[in-house]
């Protein structure tokens, strides 16, 4: 026998079946065997460019996404490698699981990071530090106006204002002049023509580099030799000095002042710290005004916890990636104070290539727990797996410490009652006090 593999669902790819059959990992085989037909259809979907999975808590969406990655790697194994996949996730569930699966299937681990970390790295030349999302949320709890500012700065209206500002910079940011190199001269009028006509499609702050390269090419042709680096760089800098500034922090501050918003403190790079509410507006301006290195090596992007991404973040992702995507999450599990239905605005961002799939049936929790949670957040379309348990006990208390001690005594009358328990409090300060 070459390989043995049992499955309740049909998987067409012979190599994937062979690899699973050769592998003795019980965890992988058990999950594959129990995948339902509708989940298998999601895993093997290769037609839709943008696949959005709205899955209730405990519906198996993460498991489906994991197996979808494995299936795609083997379905398109000639063109898609693990290095061509990027996972944007705030937690390590993907990397922890995939680190066991992919080596067994002959693949290296896939790159995974949070989108916040990705953004912070992109802004290292703009600010020395960026505020964490959790700090932003805690500030919103203390200050309702902070929540209003954050919502505003992630909105389409704010993006439209930044777009208008970017168009105005086309003229306001520029101070054109002649540029000379030895006996060669590029006149102001020639530079303006190149800048606004020939290279109009290049982002504003990268456009002058193209003008400079044109002049350098002309010089090298006439001299019949390449200019050495020590001569090229000062020449390019002459062109870049025609910008009033190329500092995105300064430009964003200029935008805030123009539109009547509270401005950021004027500080040198090494002392700048961006509030979380400003991180993605600055990043958007950076991608709007300058040419960034293309991530052409990424052929499939996986976005986890889709409900925690703002409209602005998705607009940035669209600018950064032109590849296929698997986007998954649950609008009921957002970290925001109020639910935002990303499924309402995603089609407007990604267009007709987007297909939406809903996984409503929850398998993880008992009917009592799932029903309580659904009522708490106003979810009405959840389908429950008929597994019953103890009812949820809800109590109002005035002494949190005493209530916690009582709960511990109730949950843990002996060491064998539960393996784990969680105490959820509204902020870090309360958690530290209880610990």
Regions found by a protein language model. Name each.
Residues 1-18:
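N-terminal accessory nucleic-acid engagement/regulatory domains that precede
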Residues 33-45:
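Pre-Walker A adenine-sensing motif
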Residues 47-51:
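Pre-Walker A (Motif I) flank of P-loop NTPase domains
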Residues 53-55:
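Hydrophobic anchor at the beta1->P-loop junction of P-loop NTPases
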Residues 58:
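Walker A (P-loop) phosphate-binding loop of P-loop NTPases
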Residues 61-62:
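Conserved lysine of the Walker
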Residues 73-301, 307-316, 332:
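Alpha-helical nucleic-acid-binding subdomain
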């Amino acid at each position: 026998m070459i390989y043995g593999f049992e499955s309740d669902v049909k998987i067409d790819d012979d190599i994937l079946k062979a690899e699973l059959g050769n592998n003795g990992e019980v965890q992988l085989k058990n999950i594959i065997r129990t995948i339902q037909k509708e989940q298998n259809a999601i895993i093997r979907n290769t037609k839709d460019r943008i696949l959005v999975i709205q899955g209730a808590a405990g519906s198996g969406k993460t498991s489906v996404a994991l197996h979808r990655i494995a299936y795609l790697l083997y379905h398109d194994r000639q063109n898609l490698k693990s290095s061509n996949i990027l996972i944007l996730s705030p937690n390590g569930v993907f990397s922890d699981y995939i680190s066991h699966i992919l080596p067994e299937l002959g693949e290296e681990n896939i790159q995974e990071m949070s989108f916040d970390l990705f953004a912070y790295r992109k802004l290292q030349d703009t600010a020395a530090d960026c505020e964490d999302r959790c700090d932003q949320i805690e500030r919103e709890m203390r200050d309702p106006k902070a929540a209003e500012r954050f919502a505003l700065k992630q909105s389409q209206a704010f993006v439209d204002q930044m777009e208008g500002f970017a168009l105005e910079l086309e003229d306001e940011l520029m101070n054109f002049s002649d540029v000379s190199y030895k006996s060669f001269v590029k006149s102001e009028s020639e530079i303006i023509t190149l800048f606004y006509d020939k290279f109009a499609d290049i982002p504003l702050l990268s456009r002058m580099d193209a003008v400079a390269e044109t002049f350098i090419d002309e010089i090298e042709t006439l001299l019949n030799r390449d200019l050495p680096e020590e001569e090229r760089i000062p020449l390019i800098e002459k062109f870049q000095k025609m910008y009033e500034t190329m500092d995105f922090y300064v430009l964003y501050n200029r935008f805030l002042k123009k539109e009547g918003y509270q401005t950021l403190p004027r500080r040198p790079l090494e002392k700048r710290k961006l509030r979380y509410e400003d991180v993605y507006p600055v990043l958007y301006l950076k991608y709007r005004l300058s040419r960034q290195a293309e991530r052409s090596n990424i052929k499939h992007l996986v976005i986890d916890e889709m409900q925690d991404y703002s409209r602005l973040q998705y607009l940035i992702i669209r600018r950064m990636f032109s590849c296929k995507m698997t986007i998954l999450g649950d609008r009921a599990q957002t970290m925001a104070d109020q639910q935002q239905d990303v499924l309402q605005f995603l089609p407007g961002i990604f267009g007709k290539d987007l297909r939406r799939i809903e996984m409503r049936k929850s398998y993880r929790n008992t009917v009592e727990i799932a029903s309580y949670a659904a009522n708490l957040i106003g979810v009405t379309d959840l389908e429950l797996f008929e597994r019953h348990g103890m009812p949820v006990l809800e109590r109002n208390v005035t002494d949190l410490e005493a209530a916690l001690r009582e709960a511990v005594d109730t949950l843990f009358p002996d060491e064998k009652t539960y393996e784990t328990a969680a105490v959820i409090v509204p902020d870090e300060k309360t958690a530290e006090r209880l610990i």
